[in-house]
Amino acid sequence: MAIYLQVRVASVHLMLDALHVHEILSLDAVLSGANDHAQWRDDVISTVNLARQFGLPDHNTTMGVIYSTATDSRPVMLMLDEVLGLKDLKETEWRAFPRIPSASAQFFDRVWLEEAVQRQSFRLRHPLQNDLLGLPSVANEP
């Protein structure tokens, strides 16, 4: 079993590996900087607007999830609309991803079907290369 943080950006539901989530913030409390950066604790980190990243209609997001895209990578702030909570899932609960364009498939590897609410949640790959999110690559990344 593994624990995932279920989030929403626009109409898309995502699952983030909870072991790599550092913090969840309201964007009202975040000091935004220039060039897609924000202050977090005593550091300046990159931000990624997931709506923009996935080609969804651009809008004001309300939540930020501080997340490490790879085990040894610097955290980034994923900007999204809603945090739905933690889900404890067995590997057998994940379904193979349907055929989708490779531009989208590089972000996701499995899908969880929530039949009770007629919802699909896409599991964000981990590790995920920073350059896929428009972030600079670093030497210790895979």
Residues covered by each model-derived region:
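An acidic, low-aromatic, low-complexity terminal/linker signal
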Residues: 1-142
